Amino acid sequence: MHRYRTHTCGALRPSDVGQTVRLSGWCHRIRDHGGVLFIDLRDHYGLTQCVIDSDSPAFKAAETARSEWVIRIDGRVRTRPAGTENAELPTGSVEVYIDDLEVLGPAGELPLPVFGDQEYPEETRLKYRFLDLRREKLHANIMKRGAIIDSLRRRMREGGFFEFQTPILTASSPEGARDYLVPSRVHPGKFYALPQAPQQFKQLTMIAGFDRYFQIAPCFRDEDARADRSPGEFYQLDIEMSFVTQEDVFQAVEPVLRGVFEEFANGKRVTKEFPRITYADAMLKYGVDKPDLRNPLIIADVTDEFADDAVEFKAFKGVIKSGGVVRAIPATGAAGQPRSFFDKLNDWARSEGAPGLGYIVFEEEGGALTGKGPIAKFIPPEIQARIAQKAGAKAGDAVFFAAGTEAKAAALAGKARIRIGDELKLSDTDQFAFCWVVDFPMYEWNEEDKKIDFSHNPFSMPNYDRDAFLALGEEDAEKILGIKAFQYDIVCNGIELSSGAIRNHRPDVMEKAFAIAGYGRDVLEEKFGGMLNALRLGAPPHGGIAPGVDRIVMLLCEEPNIREVVLFPMNQRAEDLMMGAPAEATPKQLRELHIRLNLPEKKG
């Protein structure tokens, strides 16, 4: 017989009745029924009920066992008495009568109970993460994460991609966030950086002549934590392809994501064909560049309607005269809501810094659509009808309004759309709704510096005739601000899984792109000289994307916080409470690295 087990704690079935078995695991729960002890023994694979009474020679040893002690038991498998079966357990129709018991690992007083679903402070959970991970739900999340990553890898290989590994110690690059720096002992005063992403390496892999790259890549960024972003490090499905258009990238990525989500969706529907939504349409219709398509409400622009001379609502008139816009957010079926519903939404809008949300409630009177509400009296019936038509409203619906600069109106309308959809329970949450957001602007006007600046990714290829782009001058500001980039985002349920782009592989186009934004060739050479040199030596057209693995797992595990799908996460301050990181270096380590500390004075 094996030293520790003949079966796992999830393996025994009625066909095993009568066998002598050996199990090892943790005491999940112990129940004392007056001379009879029931021990639920748990391991990675499941849970088995074990029974011992005073007739067993191992009874005294069993009486000493406590929760989370690790024990080994020998015993006979028997059928549970009628009426005591547990249909929720695969092993629930059998139990093991204990003949022998050995304590393999006793446990002290637990700072965090494993049995039950009690909520404990984040600090306690992270400090004793190894205990937290014994809990069924979190344990299942981590196993599901591994299965999802296996599925991603398999689907990428089936799509003709090859897995590469890129360096972890590399050079610092200005990619938006702060780098984590690693001092070099061999080169005093010099530092490596942990990669914020393998961006340059994956492009260099294409320039090196490889065709389809992928990697489950660790990325390191010294930035603040969010619910959907783990501090310090995260993983992404890094993808790059040569000789491809934007549509080729979409066709390669969609089957992978759709397949993985269908595999792990627990019966939820998954978008079959991912719709393409332009950035301009996303900002107009949804108020954000990462729309949640589970919500059916679509925002409409009604600036022209409120600008009509027949409209007497001065608040919106003033906004429009100042160059602002008015957006309409439909609220399906809201006409039947009490006044408190509308007051509550106005209070919410004021908490967002807006004066409120004007609204019209549409009802049918005498066969005609009639608007009621605080601002309806300022708007003639024919204009009300136009507003209802644009907003897709009918009798029984309401329409709310957000006014301000284009950016502020879009932001408020986007938040109001989500809020209204949630309040009225309009969203179809039984699905994973994907979309691509495309046609991002290449440039935008920087009002503060009075100059043209990059809007998003400066290294994406402009969607513009190359010769015409190279010929653009200062007098072509309007044309420049209208240029779109071959840049795209993949969004699921309102969460951005990734940005991607067709890369700017032409040095002449890249130099021009940076010159338009006010960056000289010297700046480009200084910051990205290595990449430019590679591009000058025969670079193929290439593009890619990098969906976030942690966010994918978070969605599929239906967890609101990324911490619940990461094995050993840091806290919000990027501290590992379990291992005590970051920690002070010893004087010897600092001397070897030629580092002298200049710490800020402690406050107070």
UniProtKB/Swiss-Prot annotation:
Keywords from UniProt, A to Z, are:
Aminoacyl-tRNA synthetase, ATP-binding, Cytoplasm, Ligase, Nucleotide-binding, Protein biosynthesis
Gene Ontology cellular component terms for the protein in this record: cytoplasm
Amino acids binding L-aspartate = E175, R221, H456, R503
Q: What are this entry's molecular-function GO terms? A: aspartate-tRNA ligase activity; aspartate-tRNA(Asn) ligase activity; ATP binding; nucleic acid binding
Q: InterPro entries recorded for this chain?
A: Aa-tRNA-synt_II, aa-tRNA-synth_II, aa-tRNA-synth_II/BPL/LPL, Asp-tRNA-ligase_1, Asp-tRNA-ligase_1_N, Asp/Asn-tRNA-synth_IIb, AspRS_core, GAD-like_sf
Q: Which SUPFAM superfamilies match?
A: Class II aaRS and biotin synthetases, GAD domain-like, Nucleic acid-binding proteins
The reply to whether Cytoplasm figures as a keyword in the UniProt entry is yes
UniProt site (Important for tRNA non-discrimination): H33, G83
Query: Where is the stretch described as Aspartate?
Result: 199-202
The enzyme's first-digit EC class, named in words, is ligase
Q: Which residues bind ATP?
A: R221, D222, E223, E496, G548, V549, D550, R551
Q: Name one Pfam family in it.
A: tRNA_anti-codon
What is any one GO biological process for this UniProt entry? aspartyl-tRNA aminoacylation
Where does it reside? Cytoplasm
On the tree of life, the source organism's domain of life is: Bacteria
Which cysteines bridge via disulfide bonds? none
Q: What is its EC number?
A: 6.1.1.23
HAMAP family cross-referenced by the UniProt entry: Asp_tRNA_synth_type1
Assembly, in brief, is: Homodimer.
Biological role = Aspartyl-tRNA synthetase with relaxed tRNA specificity since it is able to aspartylate not only its cognate tRNA(Asp) but also tRNA(Asn). Reaction proceeds in two steps: L-aspartate is first activated by ATP to form Asp-AMP and then transferred to the acceptor end of tRNA(Asp/Asn).
Record-stated family: Belongs to the class-II aminoacyl-tRNA synthetase family. Type 1 subfamily.
Question: What is the protein name given in its UniProt record?
Answer: Aspartate--tRNA(Asp/Asn) ligase
